[in-house]
Amino acid sequence: IKVDDNLYSRSIFTYGMETMKRISTLKVLIIGVRGLGVETAKNIILSGPAEVDIFDPNKVKINDLGSNFFLSENDVDKINRDEGCVEKLSELNKSVKVSVLKVEQKDNINDYIKSFCEKVEKYNVVVVTELQPMYFIAQLDNACRNKNIKLIYGMCLGLAGYVFTDFGPDHTIFDESGEELETYLVKSISRDEEGLVVIDNIQGTNNLKIGDGDYVKFRNVEGMTELNDENKDFEIVFQDFQSFKIGDTSKFSEYKKGGVVYQVKKPKKLQHLDFCLRSAMISDPSHPFNIADQTKKGRVELLYMAFSGVHDFYMNHKCNLPGLNNMDDAKSIVEKVKKMYDTSKENKIPWFAGIQEFDEKVVLNVARWAAANIQPVCAFFGGILAQEIIKATGKYIPISQWLIHDFFEVVENIKDDADRTLKNSRYDDQIAVFGNEIQKKIEKSNIFMVGAGATGCEFLKNFGMMGFCTEKDTKFFVTDNDNIEISNLNRQFLFRKKDVGKSKSIIAAESVQKMNPHFHVEGMQTKVCEETENIFNEEFWTKQDFIIYAVDSVDARKYIDSKVVLFQKPAVDSGTLGTKAQSQIIIPHQTLTYNDKAPPTVVQSIPVCTLRHFPSLIQHCIEWSRDSFSGYFVSDINEVKQFFVDYDGFKMKIQREGSPKLQLNKLNILKMYIDSFVNKDYKKMCECAIQSYTNN
């Protein structure tokens, strides 16, 4: 199995080559492609499986456009959701086969389910992203377990959602954490029934990062040489950040000195319960829910009951969800859930003891907005579902087995009687939740984002889908002075192979505008720094309502943060590292800012004078050659191309450059290339090369 090193370089770095090879053989079925389904499909297709099939034979509705970024207004009431987005999904990664699953309709529901379950036998993972009847999920899960197929079931109901996983009765995990193997120097090892290993923690810089259940091996131990056996590993019991126990060492030789202890990873078995059995054991305290937000005590249990109430309504109303803000529907669900709660309390079911009191508003909010797909919520759960698909390879520990989460804090300050009259628009699901007043504020916003990489692309998509900056005289500015590379394509979904070498910000802006033609977005290539304060001046910063940091440089973050504080602008900073991520909401004078907690800049960028005149390290030579190549064959060539293709745009860009000296330099370079193109003879080319070499 060959994996494209250039396209998947970051994934290989994160997952490892063996996992990437396993991913490249996966066959995935995604049932439902509203907001959650299309997010999941987008994420996993970028990851490079063999096949992804989608199934959603329902007609496109106008409110689908608020969360499915691959559907358009021309699709509404004309084609099925799966047919509407399959082509654009396939464009994300040409090495992945993307198709629509066709299932013949049957008069008898049992015959249809049987036929459907036979169709799924070819897949490794089946993902359900829409509410389904319990009997369908039960039979589908049973079919998956019989064929060792992983089942993942996710749902977004307005501002709440859940994920259920069933990886079968015998799933093997090859790597629980995905972290690098740890290695430590040994300081001492005791000789007793519970052998204690103390590591040499020099100045507290090498604390233990392994814990109970991890395995280690030893080498180069003097004295207690029995530990050096390469065929023997030891399960550890964590003691503190400098020591752990490895079991009985009383019959070993006395430890003298030295030694290295290093972590080893052993395959582990995982047993999941099927959907019906896990649901039946919901009150068993030995099978607790995963709690994502520890501040909401008892919330997960209450949400589960609310979801059960919505499902009962769905089953009793011909597989229809409660109407958006239909208070009769919502109150009937609240009453049913309240009875469930009272019965559980009377029977003293231990699992429900975590619910301090019945919060009617939580259940009401689940019920009244169950039919809504809110774009950022879909993005959140879509990321989780896609990561669970990756875990089917044996990398990382799957969710065990329920994950439930909500975002109801975002509506705490919105009045219950706010105007939520629907407009038959792409934003109807948002209007149903937030109201028309908030939607109007969203549309009237001006936003500035720095960076159009992986997180920047996701931010752009989310803001565009929600309707930000769609009113007259509003604008979403995104700036990034980088160009698109091949390695960007498997995580920056707004770019395609034909875009390699072009500006990230400009292509990203164009791509999102196709998703929502009403989105006023402008891509810029200007770096945000002191040298460009003639462009990003006081007037520019003052006009913005919100700032987003989507950069990968500490220095850039610090500079932007200083402007955020100076001009009193709310902002969000975020970044990723492999499968980890962080985000910070910044409100000047109310929260910490980035500079309040920013790490000292230890690794400085290499000064230009060092690169050009005093290169002393191999890194200097590499950086010099990379910079030179980019200048000769990427940046300068792109400017020449723009001069011929988009003269007005080139002229405007040159005028924005700032200093006359810089403008003159750009024009001289342009003249040199044009002379070379016009006079295409070998001698002229040599003169041009010699001139460039001499000047640099």
Task: Identify the function of each model-found stretch.
Residues 1-696:
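Adenine nucleotide-associated cytosolic modules
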